[in-house]
């Protein structure tokens, strides 16, 4: 806040979709697999084996043979089908061209997620809406991923390592600013 008072928090698509996949889709997959095994339905439980990457991959990137297997899973399990649809809709927020459009898409996504009656989805939606909504909708203005930021952080670590530490933070900050002089600003 002191050095970058106008900075806006922006969450990138990769990490949000990754969290959705881990906290929602994978949790539902494991829950359904365990239910099938408890009910003695080994064939249905085996359908979930090796399906993790299949469920986490964007539908548009799946080849036809894998898309058929995904359709077979989604046809029988409505919770996974809802999660898959919401995963695809969540990605659309990051394609928006303005904050207003991103907010509209977020509101629609949040409404669908809240009304899904799937505990994993509603919990994720509540957490994101309470804590991260502004960072997600800011993606409509600032189309930046963490790859650029990770590169900047790496360069900062190099400055710190070469200097063998700084005793004065203000001087360290000046060295960082000097390293990026003339490079385009992202915020």
Q: Which residue ranges define each predicted feature?
A:
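Acidic/histidine-rich catalytic cores and adjacent linkers
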Residues: 1-8, 14-17, 37-187
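Short alpha-helix plus adjacent loop in nuclease-associated cores
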Residues: 16-37
């Amino acid at each position: 806040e002191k050095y970058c008072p106008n900075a806006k928090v922006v969450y990138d698509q990769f990490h949000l979709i990754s969290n959705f996949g881990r906290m929602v889709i994978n949790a539902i997959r494991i829950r359904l697999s365990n239910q099938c095994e408890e009910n003695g339905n080994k064939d249905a439980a085996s359908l979930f084996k090796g399906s993790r990457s299949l469920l986490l991959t964007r539908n548009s990137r799946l080849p036809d043979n894998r898309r058929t297997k995904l359709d077979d899973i989604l046809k029988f399990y409505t919770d996974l089908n809802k999660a898959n649809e919401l995963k695809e809709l969540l990605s659309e927020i990051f394609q928006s061209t303005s904050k207003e459009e991103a907010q509209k898409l977020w509101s629609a996504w949040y409404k669908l997620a809240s009304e899904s009656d799937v505990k994993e989805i509603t919990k994720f939606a509540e957490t994101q809406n309470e804590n991260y909504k502004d960072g997600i909708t800011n993606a409509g203005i600032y189309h930046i991923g963490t790859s650029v930021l990770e590169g900047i952080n790496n360069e900062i670590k190099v400055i710190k390592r070469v200097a063998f530490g700084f005793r004065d933070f203000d001087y360290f900050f000046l060295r960082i600013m000097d390293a990026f002089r003339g490079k385009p600003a992202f915020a």
